[in-house]
Amino acid sequence: MPAPRYKSGSSKKVYRKAPGNSSIVHYRRKKQSKAVCGACGALLNGVPRGRAVEITKLAKTQKRPERAFGGNLCPKCVKKMMVIKARNF
């Protein structure tokens, strides 16, 4: 019976072979899902995957790209947004 802390959905089972040809179960934390664009849903490059605890340890410049809407919108959507805003200005 696994310990209660391993029954969570955030734990992932990894099967390993131990000496004597017995298989044992290790539990690992699941990775965070990849960041996606808020407008089109495309995967964002330059945004790290990881739990909040791991990401807070990173430097500010490693957390998201250094451009407008970095970490929220993909470059194509940012370009479209800039054109729309410039035309309506």
From Swiss-Prot:
GO terms for biological process: translation. Coiled coil: none annotated. GO terms for molecular function: structural constituent of ribosome. Residues 1-22 are annotated as: Disordered. GO terms for cellular component: ribonucleoprotein complex; ribosome. It holds the Pfam family Ribosomal_L34e. InterPro entries: Ribosomal_eL34, Ribosomal_eL34_C_sf, Ribosomal_L34e_arc-type. Keywords: Ribonucleoprotein, Ribosomal protein. The keyword Ribonucleoprotein applies. Belongs to the eukaryotic ribosomal protein eL34 family. This is Large ribosomal subunit protein eL34. The gene is rpl34e.
